[in-house]
Amino acid sequence: MASARRRAGAAVLLALACGTVVPGAWAQQRAATCEKPVYLTFDTGHMGIAPLVADVLKRQNVRVTFFAAAERTQTDGDSLDDHWAPWWKARAAEGNEFGSHTYDHAYWRADVKGTPPSFRIKPSAGPQNGKESTWSAAEYCANIRKSSDRLAAITGKKPLPLYRAPGGKTSPALLAAAEGCGYKYVGWAPAGFLGDELPSEKFSNAKLLTQALDTIRPGDILLAHLGIWSRKDPWAPADLEPLIVGLKEKGFCFRTLREHPAYRDWIASH
């Protein structure tokens, strides 16, 4: 079985090199040769651990999907500023994928009754940090698009037409608005919540690693961050490499969301 998968992969690589396979078909072929896929994703954070995360991913030959917002960083700027632009460009060159996390890390708080749809939104970054206000669907879409456009500008790579709402806080109306402007929401699996936002006093890295290795299942979308201000004992890189190695030993393989069956058609049509 393994040799058959290798032969199939080699054939597609040759076809890709010759220009006879389009990227979407390549993604489907890769997914077909991966029997136990998981989809590791990272949301932005203070970025203090970002170089270490990149080192682990490169060493383990793992591609991931990053969801980016312009969040405050330990370098006194934001995670999409010029200081971090080379870091993002390097991740693109390695074959990682990108999506929006809303530019201002904008939390949905509630729907506003009436038409057209509008929402109570509270950003945790940018000039309106901590201030709740009403946004129209167009304003919310513009904030999603602003992050995507910035990623494209600094990486030279078109981000996926996907986004992750901060905190996973959404409503049907909010998701419909986002899809209406070309962005499909991506959450995460219950077992895929890797726990790096939890207090390290109660949830040690050892405990989180054991829990993840015991509960993650094929097809799960996994969630971690590029630095959490409140966690005293950082989850990465302490848990990241052991998690990747442990999942590989269990027969799992890592794929980006470009290859996820729930999003392939959406990506191809947008």
Predicted segments with their positions:
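Histidine-centered catalytic micro-motifs
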Residues: F98-H105, G168-T170, L223-L226
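Bacterial N-terminal signal peptides
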Residues: A10-T20
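Active-site beta->alpha N-cap acidic-glycine motif
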Residues: Q28-W135, N143-P161
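Bacterial N-terminal signal peptides that target proteins for export
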Residues: M1-V12
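Acidic-and-aromatic substrate-binding clefts and catalytic sites of carbohydrate-active enzymes
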Residues: T44-I49, A70-H83, A106-D111, L162-P172, ...
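His/Asp/Glu-enriched short active-site or ligand-binding loop at hydrolase and phosphoryl-transfer sites
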Residues: K169-T215, F252-Y263
